[in-house]
Amino acid sequence: MARHVVLLRGINIGSRNRVAMPALRDALEEASFTDVQTYLQSGNIVVESRAKPETVRKKVEQLIEQRFGLEIAVVVRTRAELAAVVKRNPHAKVATNPKAYQVTFLEQKLSAKTVRELEQAAAGAERVVVSGREVYAWHPQTIARSKLWAKLAGKDLGVTATSRNWTTVEALVELAGGLGAFLAAGDLVPPPPPRSRAPSASASRTLAG
């Protein structure tokens, strides 16, 4: 059976959208998912299923609504896709603090207009790379006051999206089987050409293809 990484958007933030992980694990197992594991309280789940990723997404969304009465958006990646996200790592040379390095997982690719808006929002030493259905964003100063982060965390992207810091991304790869197994098996999917926004001498940012 295939292993999937299931990412929930916006749960357990303060008193809003509360979902207990033990109860969620039980519900997923009752729904015929196997080897169900969770990481932290922010909605990071690894499951095994014969279903395709899109079917897994719909099934988890429906289950959460039925069991917990919440409409929660879900993004799913196969374990090979998530391992490819880590292997790609376009900010490896500059992102020294994993808590300030965010990956935004998208249900679908962004429009060219939205990509340009993200690139224009990167300020100072911030960097952003859009690669397929992921956005890699490095916020070296502060995430809280970042216009780039505000765009990524908001609802103006035009697609379902949810973000995780680099520590969580790497932990989920390990939980799903580890990067070494994928490299040995040649199981990684080829990365799409990235579009990036990085600082330049003239305007603090430059577009790198």
Language model features with spans:
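Surface-exposed, charge/polar-rich loops and edge strands
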Residues: 2-209
